[in-house]
Amino acid sequence: MSQLVYFSSSSENTQRFIERLGLPAVRIPLNERERIQVDEPYILIVPSYGGGGTTGAVPRQVIRFLNDEHNRALLRGVIASGNRNFGEAYGRAGDVIARKCGVPWLYRFELMGTQSDIENVRKGVTEFWQRQPQNA
């Protein structure tokens, strides 16, 4: 199975979700000056920002990570967290990234997710990678 790459703000909601998920994952650093580069296809798990507005939904660190052409080329799908209080903007970062990068928006969950979200993502990620061509 290929990896997960995720970003978690200082609230650590996404970090807690990843810990409960129990799958291999690499974190995009909170410090914007630190950079990482991935070497295999991955699914991105990202929180949504901006309080429901149309701009600012994708964290700056994630934008910087995806602006690296090498990292962007290996992106295969996106999972977003958000807050249902923001209505239609719930999980908007996933929609933005999926549209701009041409990858599927696989799932969204609220805040740090429920046990059901953990099970759905674990199963969905496994099935997603099984359907991918070996050299994808």
Swiss-Prot record:
One matching Pfam family: Flavodoxin_NdrI
Gene3D superfamilies per UniProt: 3.40.50.360
Biological process per Gene Ontology, one example term: protein modification process
GO molecular function: FMN binding
Family: Belongs to the NrdI family.
Classification via NCBIfam families: nrdI (TIGR00333)
Biological function: Probably involved in ribonucleotide reductase function.
Name used for this protein in its record: Protein NrdI
Source organism: Escherichia coli O7:K1 (strain IAI39 / ExPEC)
Lineage of the organism: Bacteria, Pseudomonadati, Pseudomonadota, Gammaproteobacteria, Enterobacterales
